[in-house]
A protein has these predicted regions:
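Short amphipathic alpha-helical segments with heptad-repeat character
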Residues: 117, 121-128, 132, 139, ...
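A general structural motif at alpha-helix termini
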Residues: 58-59, 215, 271-273, 360, ...
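A helix-coil-helix interface module used to build multimeric assemblies
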Residues: 1-201, 206-212, 219, 275-276, ...
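Generic, well-ordered alpha-helical scaffold segments in large soluble proteins
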Residues: 40, 61, 65-68, 90, ...
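Glycine-rich cofactor/substrate-binding loops
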Residues: 1-36, 97-98, 265, 280-443
């Protein structure tokens, strides 16, 4: 069944090519198509395009379809083009001509837009929850190991004293900034495109404010042409947020792989969290971090993939935009999987509390000695030269006590302030409006 079907049949090869993976991708959107339809028909009844009894029956049947989606039993039949057609067909089978009325004042263009926005904001909430969970694990580890020193590096050369408190805490604070990107993406997403129809509005007296409130959007995409222009732009902006989070996790995974190697031995994974080799019986490989790194590096390409699909399109709808679904919709599950696994493995990771007992790391205390001499009155440059010559002569015996007390340093991690930043950003999403609207629609 095709919503646009007339008195001729399309070539089967053309149909195969143009439908592509739409049925597969549209399963991500199914329950959101139902929610959008529930809001739309409620509005249609309010402007006299549906009778009250018709609305009651349609809403009841849409709730049944929603339950099918929740149970994973909703399917798009082989001869049906997309999720919108499948939902309308199920309603028509059950309720006859009543089911054919739900498309009044609507195009598949604004229908898929609202589906994508409802899906995306839900997924952004789930990602925010997972980011917060990983953040909490990192802060806990930072506090647990705040006094355990490790070498800091520049140019992959040992540089200055650092600590596991700083290392874990640095990635926690990075996630705070990443959440700002996520929040901006959420705010741009959480606007109602419904009522823009094919991109030029409708002659029906649609009440767009009503559907905005019913669906729990913050506001609407006011200009109907811009609503359609937003297709692809939303995905690109969300893609940047996903890529930013993925960048933090990929870097952390790289560090962990490096620190887990025998040449570093800074951290250790429990053996049940490693994999082995088919030929080398001693191997305990950090595959989990390697796969997190690879998956997150792939996710960092998402905004570029979206841009390359849409960057030469003029105003209006084009079928090119369908291809964005194939890279965009699965990305949320991939990122959530990486976040969940990262939180799990960070919880299990063990740290070496005696790294700096090895004299090979003594030079990292050189700056501490320079500063001590400078504080005692020696000119800084003279102190710098003296310590450098002592190291070259093998005469440097460092005092390994650390005296860092300023904000954000080894002795003053500022984890409490970082936690406040994260909580403020998380609270500013205001997910409760979205959740309340969905609950009200479903009764």
């Amino acid at each position: 069944m095709k919503l646009w079907e007339k008195n001729f049949e399309i070539n089967k090869e053309i149909e195969r090519f143009t439908v592509g993976r739409d049925r597969e991708m549209d399963l991500y959107l199914a329950k959101y198509d139902v929610l959008g339809s529930m809001a739309h028909i409620t509005m249609l009844e309010s402007i006299g395009l549906l009778e009250k009894d018709e609305l009651t029956q349609l809403l009841a049947e849409l709730k049944n379809i929603y339950r099918l989606c929740e149970r994973g039993e909703f399917l798009i039949e082989d001869d049906v083009e997309d999720v919108h057609s499948q939902v309308e067909m199920l309603l028509t089978r059950k309720l006859g001509d009543m089911g054919k009325k739900i498309h009044s004042g609507r195009s598949r263009n604004d229908q898929v837009l609202v589906d994508l926005k409802l899906f995306t904001r839900h997924e952004l909430k789930e990602i925010a929850d997972e980011v917060k969970s990983l953040f909490d694990e990192l802060i806990q580890k930072s506090n647990q190991y705040k006094d355990v020193l490790m070498p800091g590096y520049t140019h992959l050369q040992v540089a200055m004293p650092s600590s596991f408190g700083l290392w874990f805490g640095a990635y926690a604070e990075s996630l705070c900034d990443d959440m700002l990107f996520l929040q901006a993406a959420y705010k741009m997403t959480n606007r109602n495109p419904l009522g823009s129809a094919a991109g030029y509005g409708s002659s029906f007296p649609l009440n767009r404010t009503m559907t905005t409130e019913l669906l729990g959007f913050d506001s609407m995409d006011y200009n109907v042409v811009y609503a359609q222009m937003g297709r692809g732009k939303m995905e690109r902006n969300v893609g940047f947020a996903i890529a930013t989070i993925a960048g933090t996790i990929a870097k952390m995974a790289f560090d962990a792989c490096l620190f887990n190697s025998q040449n570093f031995s800074f951290v250790k994974l429990p053996k049940e969290c490693t994999t082995g080799s088919s030929i080398m019986p001693h191997k305990k490989n950090p595959d989990v971090f390697e796969l997190i790194r690879a998956k997150c590096n792939k996710l960092q390409s998402l905004p570029q993939q979206v841009m390359l699909i849409m960057n030469n399109l003029p105003v209006g709808y084009f079928r090119d935009l369908q291809i964005i679904k194939e890279v965009f919709l699965p990305a949320f599950g991939e990122l959530k999987d990486c976040l969940q696994m990262a939180a799990y493995i960070i919880n299990k990771i063990e740290v070496n509390e005696h790294i700096l007992d090895n004299p090979m790391y003594d030079p990292i205390f050189s700056v501490e000695e320079v500063n001590r001499l400078a504080a005692a009155g020696m000119p800084f440059r003279d102190a710098y030269k003296k310590v450098g010559l002592d190291i070259e002569a093998g005469q440097f015996t460092p005092d390994k006590r650390i005296h860092h007390t300023h904000e954000g340093s080894i002795g003053n991690l500022c984890n409490e302030q970082i936690q406040v930043l994260m909580q403020q950003t998380f609270d500013d999403f205001h997910f409760e409006r979205m959740l309340k609207a969905e609950k009200n629609l479903l009764g």
